[in-house]
A protein has these predicted regions:
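Membrane-interfacial, low-structure loops and terminal tails that flank and connect transmembrane helices
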Residues: 1-2, 61-71
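Internal/C-terminal transmembrane anchor helices
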Residues: 69-93
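Membrane-embedded alpha-helical segments of integral membrane proteins
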Residues: 8-62
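Short, low-complexity, Pro/Ser/Thr/Gly-rich segments in the mature regions of secreted, periplasmic
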Residues: 251-259
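A structural signal for short, hydrophobic/glycine-enriched beta-strand patches
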Residues: 88-246, 259
């Protein structure tokens, strides 16, 4: 009886975890209309977990019947291996992402601020976090210049770079310290075109990339690929969007790796 009660409690706890997780991944959609692979996969995983827990006796019977056949054992084995490898892979990526997020620049260098969404002609909250991080660094290091990097989306009235330039000036950064790269549409283009601007202005290849922490590991990998000697300066992320962005980044890093 006690064992049965403990099992029910454990299943109840897991269902609550799944419901809470679903709510966490739903937040970006309800707050800002954000729906991407990060929260889609997150919500799907939570629904799957809840379904498996609720139907656990049936799941056990189904798997038990399946493993009685050779083909069934093969299917169960393959699914188990994929699941274990997936968990390990996500754990490895998360460890590397955390490491890149926590690292701080050792020496002053030109900043490259990576753009993100502009709402009309104003920076989004996420973009302002990057701008604030860059502004704090620039005001503390008066000799450092900055490249603001980001093109203009179809629903944006100005480029991400121009939005960042205006915001930096509003925060007391002199206009002659700001270089604008407003053609890019991806992290690869951000850093490729920014490197060209560094070369045009005789600023070498050393740089400090400013982005949100979850994105830093991938951004630095891309920077290395285009020939920049880069370090990272992580901006904070809003708690309600971080889990979604984190899961999305797993897919982004993996796809970048597959592309070489």
């Amino acid at each position: 009886m006690r064992t049965l009660t403990l099992r029910r409690v454990a299943r109840g706890v897991l269902v609550l975890v799944a419901v809470y997780g679903f709510w966490v991944f739903l937040q970006p959609l309800t707050i800002a209309g954000i729906l991407n692979v990060g929260n889609a996969v997150g919500m799907g995983a939570c629904v799957l977990l809840a379904g498996v827990v609720v139907a656990w006796p049936r799941v056990v019977r189904f798997v038990s019947a399946l493993v009685k056949r050779r083909s069934g054992r093969l299917v169960v084995g393959v699914v188990a291996v994929i699941a274990v490898l997936g968990v390990v892979w996500c754990g490895v990526l998360s460890a590397r992402m955390v490491g890149a997020m926590r690292a701080e620049p050792e020496e002053p260098a030109t900043l490259i601020v990576l753009g993100c969404k502009v709402e009309g002609d104003r920076p989004s909250v996420a973009l302002l976090r990057r701008v604030d991080t860059a502004a704090d660094y620039l005001l503390a290091h008066p000799s450092v210049q900055v490249v603001v990097s980001g093109g203009q989306g179809a629903d944006e009235l100005i480029s991400e770079a121009e939005a960042m330039r205006r915001a930096l000036v509003d925060r007391g950064v002199a206009e002659d310290r700001i270089l604008v790269e407003d053609r890019s549409t991806s992290t690869l283009e951000n850093l490729t075109f920014s490197k060209e601007i560094l070369a045009e202005n005789g600023l070498g290849t050393s740089a400090i990339v400013v982005s949100e922490g979850y994105h830093m590991y991938r951004a630095l990998r891309v920077a290395d690929r285009v020939g920049l000697d880069a370090e990272g300066l992580a901006a904070p992320s809003a708690a309600w969007v971080l889990p979604t962005s984190w899961v999305r980044e797993w897919f982004g890093i993996t796809l970048d790796g597959l592309k070489g």
